[in-house]
């Protein structure tokens, strides 16, 4: 077994598969575990994904938001156990892979450049409806057996 295969084998145990798929331009809410002193709490960070750096297990993504008129960017490791969950607030349609140019734009210009991606939103809603229907169908036979 060569070195690369061994590294992939070890890393595969820690890869997260429970997180949703997202792209640059999407607005996401990241729930991140923060340790303050002797207690831990969950902190939400909501903003636009401006970059995804794919590097296997070391994949990171950058989220940008404007808080009280100041732009804040945070880099999250995708496979970190400190990430509780990632919620996709809105799907965006970006024409670039790296959205560094939005650092210089106003909120109004950002909304115009990153329009909502209706096709991906509709696919997500259809998938959610199908999943709910499957759960309901699975529960109906159980109720009739009782």
Swiss-Prot record:
Residues 121-146 are annotated as: Disordered. Pfam families: Ribosomal_L19. GO terms for molecular function: structural constituent of ribosome. GO terms for biological process: translation. Keywords: Ribonucleoprotein, Ribosomal protein. The keyword Transmembrane helix does not apply. Residues 121-140 have a biased composition (Basic and acidic residues). One of its GO terms (cellular component) is cytosolic large ribosomal subunit. InterPro entries: Ribosomal_bL19, Ribosomal_bL19_CS, Ribosomal_bL19_sf, Translation_prot_SH3-like_sf. It comes from the Bacteria. This protein is located at the 30S-50S ribosomal subunit interface and may play a role in the structure and function of the aminoacyl-tRNA binding site. Belongs to the bacterial ribosomal protein bL19 family. PANTHER family: LARGE RIBOSOMAL SUBUNIT PROTEIN BL19M, RIBOSOMAL PROTEIN L19. This is Large ribosomal subunit protein bL19. It comes from Thermus thermophilus (strain ATCC BAA-163 / DSM 7039 / HB27).
């Amino acid at each position: 077994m060569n070195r690369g295969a061994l590294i992939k084998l070890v890393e595969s145990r820690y890869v997260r598969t429970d997180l949703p798929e997202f792209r640059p331009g999407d607005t996401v809410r990241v729930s991140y575990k923060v340790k303050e002193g002797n207690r831990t709490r969950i902190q939400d960070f909501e903003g636009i994904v401006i970059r995804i750096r794919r590097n296997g297990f070391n994949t990171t993504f950058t989220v940008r938001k404007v808080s009280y008129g100041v732009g804040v960017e945070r880099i999250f490791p995708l496979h970190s156990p400190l990430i509780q969950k990632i919620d996709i607030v809105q799907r965006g349609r970006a024409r670039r892979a790296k959205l560094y140019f939005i650092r210089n734009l106003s909120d109004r210009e950002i909304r115009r450049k990153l329009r909502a991606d209706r096709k991906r939103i509709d696919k997500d809603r259809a998938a959610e409806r199908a999943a709910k229907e499957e759960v309901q169908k699975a529960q109906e036979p159980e109720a009739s057996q009782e």
